[in-house]
C-alpha cells in the first residue's frame, strides 16, 4: 500500500526542521505520492505570499516537494470513486471540503492511505485508511 501526503503534512515539513526526503525514504514498503490537488494548494500558498523573501522560500520548498514525490493525477478511476463518495457523503449529510473529497477518492481508487493532520474531515469517509499527524 502506498501513501498520499496531504498538504497539511507538507506544511508541517515546511515549518519544521523535519526532512521530507528522510520521511519518504524511511517508508521502504510503500511509495509516497503527492496529489495534483495538494500541488495546487502548495503553489497557491506561493502566489499568496506578500513578501518576496517568503515567496522565494515557499517556492523553493514546493519545487523540492515536486521533485521528491511522484504526482498522482486525477484519472477516470479517481473520478468514478469521487462521484460515488460525493453521492454517499451528500446522502448522509456528512460532506467534506471539495479538495479533501478528491484526495479521499484518489486514495480509495488507488488503494492508498492518506497522511494528514485534517482528520476531522477524512474520518467521515468510510474505508479510508488515515495516518494521523498532530
What are these regions (language model features)?
Residues 44-47, 56, 68-117:
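Active-site neighborhoods of divalent-metal-dependent phosphate/nucleic-acid chemistry enzymes
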Amino acid at each position: 500500500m502506498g501513501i498520499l501526503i496531504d498538504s497539511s503534512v507538507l506544511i508541517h515539513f515546511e515549518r519544521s526542521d523535519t526532512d521530507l526526503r528522510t520521511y519518504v525514504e524511511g517508508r521502504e514498503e510503500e511509495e509516497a505520492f503527492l496529489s495534483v490537488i495538494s500541488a495546487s494548494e502548495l503553489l497557491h500558498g506561493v502566489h499568496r505570499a506578500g513578501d518576496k523573501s517568503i515567496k522565494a522560500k515557499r517556492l523553493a520548498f514546493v519545487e523540492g516537494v515536486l521533485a521528491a514525490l511522484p504526482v498522482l493525477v486525477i484519472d477516470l478511476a479517481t473520478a468514478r470513486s469521487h462521484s460515488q463518495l460525493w453521492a454517499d457523503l451528500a446522502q448522509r449529510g456528512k460532506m467534506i471540503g471539495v479538495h479533501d473529497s478528491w484526495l479521499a477518492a484518489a486514495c480509495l481508487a488507488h488503494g492508498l492511505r492518506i497522511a494528514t493532520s485534517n482528520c476531522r474531515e477524512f474520518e467521515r469517509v468510510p474505508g479510508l485508511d488515515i495516518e494521523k499527524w498532530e
